[in-house]
UniProtKB/Swiss-Prot annotation:
HAMAP family: 3_HAO. It comes from Neurospora crassa (strain ATCC 24698 / 74-OR23-1A / CBS 708.71 / DSM 1257 / FGSC 987). It is an enzyme of class 1 (oxidoreductase). Substrate binds at residues 54, 96, 106. This is 3-hydroxyanthranilate 3,4-dioxygenase. Belongs to the 3-HAO family. Gene3D superfamilies: Jelly Rolls (2.60.120.10).
Amino acid sequence: MLSSPVNLPKWLEENSHLLKPPINNYCVYNDDFTVMIVGGPNARTDYHINQTPEWFYQYKGAMMLKVVDDGNFRDIIIREGEMFLLPGNTPHNPVRFADTVGIVLEQKRPADTIDRMRWYCQNCKEIVHEASFHCTDLGTQIKAAVEAFKGNEQLRTCKKCGVLADWSPKPGSIQDPNVQ
């Protein structure tokens, strides 16, 4: 049986409490496609690598999508009303700010695909740690990987330069495009 359409403003009014850290998302549909409503703020330093594309739409406010594009670290600002299609296998860190809401659409993962969570050294940009898993429940699996990294200084120590990687961004280290 088909479900009813979602009235997004009404849904947010009634359910915004469901958008909780560290991922701040709620899965609205989870069949051939996963549709998530995502709120801010969040505070993560990991880069997610999904083998399939991800579609981002910013319903309220702007977000920053930190990416590694052909080996270069850069920030993509997705403003209110804008959408962006991220190609598969692109390391990305979605940064969401207070009072922002977006929609993310992902394909259901084929059985042979592996998602990865990668942390880079803020000093030398080497990979500090990588966790991998077949994604069946994005919210719980990403949260578990983030919590494991947060709680283990050995995982967070760069083997190249010895710097302890941050598990969350330092206050003030990310410019909020909503206040410029």
